[in-house]
């Protein structure tokens, strides 16, 4: 099972690349890697990013998005890594701007997936908040690759397009025993300031 850290966004709203922003002296991407490593669930953790940022990561497993799908958002990162690892049975996806994700959240979602896998033949297990799904904290089966490819070749790179074609189920973020901010993504500097005040 591989983990994909999505870190290819332009971070326009934040003002600088979010992967290298810091919480308590630790970069977002380092925090996410450390959390994923602590679960002992993954045989490889891969950072998905763009050519401009790739050399700035102090980490060996960095993959640049497929050049045919530049600037097509997070689906391009998932697509690129799934294509490179056709033998893999499952992928966990998390965005780099979710620095407070916990190992407990990852393992809880995995247990949810496994418990529903046989009965529901799930392709995707994701979290949801107030009825809205969070596609960038989710497990994806390789079966999702076809729907992702189709979306990337259309003019709509929305996860909604992908999810409509797949067997998907959701776990509420409140079902995780963790601080209430564990799943929050940081879009603006004031989001980070507010998070730091809570820590």
Curated annotation (Swiss-Prot):
Q: Tell me the GO molecular function terms.
A: GTP binding; metal ion binding; molybdenum cofactor guanylyltransferase activity; nucleotidyltransferase activity
- EC class of the enzyme, as a word: transferase
Tell me the residue numbers annotated for binding GTP: 6-8, 18, 65, 97
Name where it's found. Answer: Cytoplasm
Its taxonomic path starts at:
Bacteria, Bacillati, Bacillota, Bacilli, Bacillales
Q: List the GO cellular component terms.
A: cytoplasm
Q: Does the keyword Nucleotide-binding apply?
A: yes
What InterPro entries does this protein map onto?
Answer: MobA-like_NTP_Trfase (IPR025877), Molybde_CF_guanTrfase (IPR013482), Nucleotide-diphossugar_trans (IPR029044)
User: What PANTHER family does the entry give?
Assistant: MOLYBDENUM COFACTOR GUANYLYLTRANSFERASE (PTHR19136:SF81)
Q: Which Pfam families match?
A: NTP_transf_3
Query: Its catalytic activity?
Result: Mo-molybdopterin + GTP + H(+) = Mo-molybdopterin guanine dinucleotide + diphosphate
Among Gene3D superfamilies, the record links this protein to: Spore Coat Polysaccharide Biosynthesis Protein SpsA, Chain A (3.90.550.10)
Q: What is its EC number?
A: 2.7.7.77
Q: What does the sequence similarity comment in the record state about its family? A: Belongs to the MobA family.
Q: Which UniProt keywords apply?
A: Cytoplasm, GTP-binding, Magnesium, Metal-binding, Molybdenum cofactor biosynthesis, Nucleotide-binding, Transferase
Protein name as annotated: Probable molybdenum cofactor guanylyltransferase
What HAMAP family does the record point to?
A: MobA
So which cofactors does this thing need? Mg(2+)
The record describes the protein's role as:
Transfers a GMP moiety from GTP to Mo-molybdopterin (Mo-MPT) cofactor (Moco or molybdenum cofactor) to form Mo-molybdopterin guanine dinucleotide (Mo-MGD) cofactor.
| Predominant location | cytoplasm
Q: What is known of its domains?
A: The N-terminal domain determines nucleotide recognition and specific binding, while the C-terminal domain determines the specific binding to the target protein.
Q: Which GO biological process annotations does it have?
A: Mo-molybdopterin cofactor biosynthetic process
Q: Which residues bind Mg(2+)?
A: 97
């Amino acid at each position: 099972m591989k983990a994909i850290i999505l870190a290819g966004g332009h971070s326009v709203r934040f003002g600088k690349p979010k992967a290298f922003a810091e919480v308590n002296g630790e970069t977002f991407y380092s925090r996410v890697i450390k959390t994923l490593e602590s679960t002992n669930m993954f045989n490889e953790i891969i950072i998905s990013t763009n050519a401009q940022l790739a050399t700035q990561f102090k980490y060996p497993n960095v993959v640049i998005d497929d050049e045919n799908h530049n600037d097509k958002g997070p689906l391009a990162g998932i697509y690129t890594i799934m294509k490179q690892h056709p033998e893999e049975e499952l992928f966990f996806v998390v965005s780099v701007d979710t620095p407070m994700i916990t190992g407990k959240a990852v393992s809880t979602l995995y247990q949810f997936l496994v418990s529903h896998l046989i009965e529901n033949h799930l392709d995707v297990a994701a979290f949801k908040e107030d009825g809205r799904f969070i596609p960038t904290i989710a497990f994806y089966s390789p079966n999702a690759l076809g729907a992702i490819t189709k979306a990337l070749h259309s003019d709509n790179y929305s996860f909604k397009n992908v999810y409509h074609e797949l067997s998907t189920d959701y776990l509420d973020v409140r079902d995780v025993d963790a601080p209430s901010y564990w799943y929050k993504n940081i879009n603006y500097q004031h989001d980070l300031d507010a998070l730091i005040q809570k820590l």
